[in-house]
Amino acid sequence: MAIRKYKPTTPGRRGSSVADFAEITRSTPEKSLLRPLPKHGGRNNAGRITTRHIGGGHKRQYRVIDFKRNDKDGVLATVAHIEYDPNRTARIALLHFIDGSKRYIIAPNKLKQGDKIESGPQADIKPGNNLPLRNIPTGTVIHAIELRPGGGAKMGRSAGASVRLVAKDGPYAQLRLPSGEIRNVDARCRATIGEVGNAEQSNINWGKAGRMRWKGVRPTVRGVAMNPVDHPHGGGEGKTSGGRHPVSPWGQKEGRTRHINKPSDKLIVRRRNAGKKRK
């Protein structure tokens, strides 16, 4: 993938860029793998906003992705197409299996149309093949990793993501995540070889607010720019600093919000941001 930059023909085009989509081989998705994807605008069944900054955007259909890949062991598949997916930053690959079935998977880097891939403990170590962690050599770069055996891939799914298998210790495999965290994962869990493609996605400059609206992202308004009825930082004559420590719209003090002492914490060998003081 490469980034195509625009000339500053308008203020919105100045500095903006777009993916060149050179790796895409088909513009229409596989109909049998599409599902409806209604929009809710960040609202619950009572009509109240539960997630801010969501609304509008282009209509989408959900592409059903096979994150488990555990029911086609030993069945050879051919990469029929590399496609765009509006629901994720990564590209997706359409597989045609020799038994006639079709599946979508996350497209790893260097996977191309016509490649042969498979899953199972005996699969070769090459991009796109899916194996249990205990069958993958130490030092291999992987993605689409399960956290529980048979639970489907949960980690390493976004564009450019890569996780390294650094060690194996009894029933566990040690993984170095993109955040820097080193974590134990059950060695029976599956992962796919290679890193996720479309790595230049993070370098795209969206250029104008309208492009984010096309993506379904609404504006993020500062609390100090609101009225007192809308936010604890709102109001005041002229520009103000908010007059208090930063808080959320509901009065919760800013800072880290992740719960500590989760049951899964015992699987963390080295935390991300190790040594950083928690607030």
Swiss-Prot record:
Any one GO MF annotation of this record: transferase activity
Biased composition (Basic and acidic residues): 253-268
Gene Ontology terms: biological process: cytoplasmic translation
UniProt superkingdom: Bacteria
A Gene Ontology term for the protein's cellular component: large ribosomal subunit
InterPro entries given in the database record: NA-bd_OB-fold (IPR012340), Rib_uL2_dom2 (IPR014722), Ribosomal_uL2 (IPR002171), Ribosomal_uL2_bac/org-type (IPR005880), Ribosomal_uL2_C (IPR022669), Ribosomal_uL2_CS (IPR022671), Ribosomal_uL2_dom3 (IPR014726), Ribosomal_uL2_RNA-bd_dom (IPR022666)
Bias type Basic residues, positions: 269-279
Region described as Disordered: 32-53, 225-279
Ribonucleoprotein recorded as keyword: yes
PANTHER family attached to this UniProt entry: LARGE RIBOSOMAL SUBUNIT PROTEIN UL2M, RIBOSOMAL PROTEIN L2
Oligomer status and interactors: Part of the 50S ribosomal subunit. Forms a bridge to the 30S subunit in the 70S ribosome.
Family statement drawn from the similarity comment of this UniProt entry: Belongs to the universal ribosomal protein uL2 family.
The protein's role, per its UniProt record: One of the primary rRNA binding proteins. Required for association of the 30S and 50S subunits to form the 70S ribosome, for tRNA binding and peptide bond formation. It has been suggested to have peptidyltransferase activity; this is somewhat controversial. Makes several contacts with the 16S rRNA in the 70S ribosome.
Protein name: Large ribosomal subunit protein uL2
UniProt organism field: Clavibacter michiganensis subsp. michiganensis (strain NCPPB 382)
